[in-house]
């Protein structure tokens, strides 16, 4: 199974169940995606827990204090192992007319679409978040 799709599905399921915290197995790519989600304000906090085997990431999800709606409305995988999606800096996709974020894997690491566009580098579009 695709580990990134599994990571996104665990977050999606935790949001649907209104969980405050979700724990996912750690990997370097998941850590970088988590950092981008935190920097863009989609999650409240995160903590990397190292263990003997793999470690885990505890993610505190962000909800609106009054309406209890999640900051993440939709999170979807774009580039899949069977069909990779690559883009140039000029053709970087706009998510929800700029209101959402595309997370991109570039030669300089994993970053948001806006950061990649500013650095004028393209890469593999991992997922959309809005």
Swiss-Prot record:
GO terms for biological process: translation. The keyword tRNA processing does not apply. It holds the Pfam family Ribosomal_S8. Keywords: Ribonucleoprotein, Ribosomal protein, RNA-binding, rRNA-binding. InterPro entries: Ribosomal_uS8, Ribosomal_uS8_CS, Ribosomal_uS8_sf. One of its GO terms (cellular component) is ribonucleoprotein complex. Transmembrane segments: none annotated. It comes from the Bacteria. GO terms for molecular function: rRNA binding; structural constituent of ribosome. Belongs to the universal ribosomal protein uS8 family. Part of the 30S ribosomal subunit. Contacts proteins S5 and S12. One of the primary rRNA binding proteins, it binds directly to 16S rRNA central domain where it helps coordinate assembly of the platform of the 30S subunit. PANTHER family: 40S RIBOSOMAL PROTEIN S15A. This is Small ribosomal subunit protein uS8. It comes from Cytophaga hutchinsonii (strain ATCC 33406 / DSM 1761 / CIP 103989 / NBRC 15051 / NCIMB 9469 / D465).
């Amino acid at each position: 199974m695709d580990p990134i799709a599994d990571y996104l599905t665990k977050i999606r399921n935790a949001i649907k169940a209104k969980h405050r915290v979700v724990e996912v197995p750690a990997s370097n790519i998941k850590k970088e995606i988590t950092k981008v989600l935190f920097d863009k304000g989609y999650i409240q906090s995160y903590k990397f827990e190292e263990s003997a085997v793999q470690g885990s990431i505890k993610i505190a999800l962000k909800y609106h204090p009054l309406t209890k709606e999640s900051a993440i409305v939709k999170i979807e995988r774009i580039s899949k192992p069977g069909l990779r999606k690559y883009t140039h800096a000029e053709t970087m996709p706009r998510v929800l007319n700029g209101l959402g974020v595309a997370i991109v894997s570039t030669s300089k690491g994993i970053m948001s679409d806006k950061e990649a566009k500013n650095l004028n580098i393209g890469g593999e579009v991992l997922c959309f978040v809005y």
